[in-house]
Amino acid sequence: MLYKRLSSIPRRETSFMRSANFSIFLSLVLILSVCLFPPAVTAKDREERYVVLIDPAHGGRDDGVRLSTGLFEKDVTLTIARLIEKEFEGSKKIRIRLSRMGDTDVPRSDRIREAIKSEADLFLSIHVNAGFDRESSGFEVYFQGFRTSTSAKGDKSASSEIVKDMVRTKNLNESVRFAKILQARMDKVFPRLDRGLREGPVLVLQGLNIPAVELEVGFATNPKDRKKLADEGMQRFVAHALSESIKEFF
């Protein structure tokens, strides 16, 4: 009887030790993840410039929505993107890259690939909205919602997913922070026409592992919005608001 009692102790200790070892391993993973994946905006060496990828929606055969005769969404978004790029010429802190330089077809996958290739710290996709009626107006800011993975199996897979979820959380927090900055700046362009921040699956943002937002800058179906967006002075105003948002973010 005594032998049986004594022989059962090592098994309980072994089980306990395995549990303790996994807890220690998990703690180390969490600590290392914080060291290896700091907040996105501090990941760059301070001697390097932050890279912002501006994505002017549509292009080439894809016109987007029509604002007036001969003027389409693809034209307005590219003009605004180029104006932003011009505002940062000579900047020692921030470098602007565009997902398309002219009126060309650029698949969504190539836009994402360019963000990854350029090691962008921030992604901003610019669009013009359209509604089912003439009353809808103003701007909207979208960011990719957070989704945890539930497919992990085993201790190592679970710890790996925890690290990934921590990175996703940081990117989401930074995306929301930038979205709020944009919201405040754009309110000066479209006063009292803020349609709020929108969370959800955004196609153009999927596959990105950096802070990223999509801006719907106004409604082509609304006469007042359409007139604003077709005006060159207003396009410069929008570009300046977005440039100031980028500066404030970093």
Where do the language-model regions lie?
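Alpha-helix C-capping/helix-to-loop hinge sites
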Residues: 166-169, 226
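Active-site-adjacent mobile loop/cap segments within catalytic or ligand-binding domains
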Residues: 128-133, 183, 187-250
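Bacterial N-terminal signal peptides
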Residues: 24-35
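N-terminal secretory signal peptides that target proteins for export/translocation
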Residues: 1-20
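Catalytic-core regions of hydrolytic enzymes
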Residues: 41-161, 168-173, 178, 240
